[in-house]
Amino acid sequence: MAKKKGEGPGLMSSAGLMRYFESEETSIKLDPKMVIGAGIASGVAIMALNITFGLWP
């Protein structure tokens, strides 16, 4: 039968994951819909400036 491995390497990797998830809690949360909306709004603003001032070749 196969021997059961100890928790040596597994314990180290799980500690790293805990630190990752703890640091993620303090980051800025953005809704993906807001990011796509900001991209579309930026594109519309650039096209409006292009039509108005003709700055884009």
UniProtKB/Swiss-Prot annotation:
Pfam families: Sec61_beta (PF03911). Keywords: Cell membrane, Membrane, Protein transport, Translocation, Transmembrane, Transmembrane helix, Transport. It is a single-pass membrane protein. GO terms for cellular component: plasma membrane. The chain crosses the membrane at residues 32-53. GO terms for biological process: protein transport. Residues 1-31 are cytoplasmic. It comes from the Archaea. The keyword Transmembrane applies. InterPro entries: Preprot_translocase_SecG, SecG/Sec61-beta/Sbh. Residues 54-57 are extracellular. It is found in: Cell membrane. Involved in protein export. The function of the beta subunit is unknown, but it may be involved in stabilization of the trimeric complex. Belongs to the SEC61-beta family. NCBIfam families: PRK01253.1. Component of the protein translocase complex. Heterotrimer consisting of alpha (SecY), beta (SecG) and gamma (SecE) subunits. Can form oligomers of the heterotrimer. This is Preprotein translocase subunit SecG. It comes from Methanothrix thermoacetophila (strain DSM 6194 / JCM 14653 / NBRC 101360 / PT) (Methanosaeta thermophila). The gene is secG.
